Amino acid sequence: MTEPVPDLQDKAVRVCASDELVDGGAGVRVPAAEASGDAVVFFVRYDGQPYGYLNRCAHVPMELDWNEGQFFESSGLYLMCATHGAIYEPDTGKCVGGPCRGARLRALTVEERDTPEGRAVFWLPDDALRPA
């Protein structure tokens, strides 16, 4: 994972309430920006932990979700690209099946914290990928 930029580390972005991410369920999309232009990042929960990735397949630079926020295949065990069927481990972003086997999704730094409103998921941006 890319290390958070020190000046942005204190500016963590609240993504959602923790209970909005369910293991193997729908993800949350967030607009982002990188040097090459606009992007989208997404956040999911797997095995009780939140994870975040750039919404771009490692095979062809297209968004993964089937329908907006639908990243898991039917078993809820793998993330799957809707275009060519690449299968990714949700906890590592590693492609374990399909045309880009061995490649990885671009991971984000994610934390879960207690807040006055309840537990929430936060994205800690880095120097290459920031909130839009």
Each PLM stretch: what is its role?
Residues 85, 94-96:
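A conserved acidic, glycine/proline-rich C-terminal tail/linker
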Residues 96-102:
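C-terminal structural segments of small proteins and small subunits
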Residues 57, 81-84:
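Short cysteine clusters
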